[in-house]
Amino acid sequence: MKTRSALVAVSTAGLLLVAGTTAATVAHAADLPPGAPPGVCPVDTEHGPPLASPTTTASRLFGARTFLEGPVWVADPGYLLMSDMRAATGPQRVQPSTMLRYTPGPATVETVVAESGSNGLALSPDGTSIVAATHDQRSVSRYQLADLSRQTVAATFQGAAFNSPNDVTVRSDGVVYFTDPDFQRGRRADAMNGRTSVFRVSGSTVTLVDDGLRQPNGIALSPDGGTLYVGAYGENKIYSYPVRADGSTGPRTLFASIAGPDGGTIDCAGNVYWASGTDGLVHVFSPTGVKLGTVASGAGTTNVAFGGTDRQTLFITSGRTGDSGLYSVHLGVPGYPY
């Protein structure tokens, strides 16, 4: 999730930018666990263009919410979960949030976790739980779908509390990557000393990916697991990182530039979809960074996920006051459930 202030757009990307990390040999994609959740992307399938038109428009499914974020599709039995974030409260000025469930045909919307504390959501590789960026406890959490019980995945790095974990993605072997800007830290102590970072969780071990980004926000993995994408909201840029077989990453490069990059997702052809909270569009890029077009929805677009019976419906959350809602459009390629 972003702040509500507008940022100025920057020019289209194309130059290489290397982070202050040590370069290392990256494993070939064939040696990597896939980034796509198991069963989502058909193997050895040719895909056509994702957009019928370079300027596509989504339809509104429902509104009258506060600030929707973090959509994730649960294929069995077939519903979409998302976070609804409210205004900051209490002396620490922390934003409460609920977890909602949208079920299509006939459409219903209901609260499943009244105080989830969540922002970005992802699906575990076995499909039994939701991995959530939970800013209420400055942690990454796991919600079991069977009973919605909550467990902590990660709460500190080298003994220091995170700022406010924002968005999350999970590799097929269970390695978790998440962003940690300070948007929902409120008045709680800055244990990160001004740094906003990207982290990796392998088992119980938390490792720093990058602490040189200004307000990292959305995060996603390529279908072959070989590339990690991160949107830096404070820089108007989307970066990519090569991923090694053990989950570690190489130097970042500039993938694309859009105004206010929020949440992102990937389709099974490797195309990259990124929500812009500034212009209210979802920007679509090829795996090489070529701009394919945009999808228009509500102002203040926050995040995206694929779902539906054929996984070709792109769900889009919008969070701007007065225009918060869920939108959808059917596309030509199936994609990730978060």
Q: Which residues make up each language-model segment?
A:
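C-terminal region of N-terminal signal peptides and the immediate post-cleavage residues
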Residues: 18-36
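A short helix->beta-strand "capping" segment at the edge of beta-propeller domains
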Residues: 37-65, 104, 252, 332
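A short beta-strand motif characteristic of beta-propeller blades
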Residues: 56-62, 107-113, 151-158, 205-211, ...
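Beta-rich, blade/repeat-based domains predominating
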Residues: 64-78, 94-96, 113-134, 158-176, ...
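Short, conserved, GDST-rich strand-edge loop motifs in beta-rich repeat architectures
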Residues: 82-94, 178-193, 326
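Short glycine/acidic-enriched loop and turn motifs that connect beta-strands
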Residues: 87-90, 137-138, 183-186, 235-237, ...
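Short loop/turn segments that connect beta-strands within beta-propeller blades
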Residues: 102-107, 144-148, 201-205, 242-247, ...
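Blade-level signature of beta-propeller repeat domains, shared across WD40, Kelch, NHL, RCC1
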Residues: 303-338
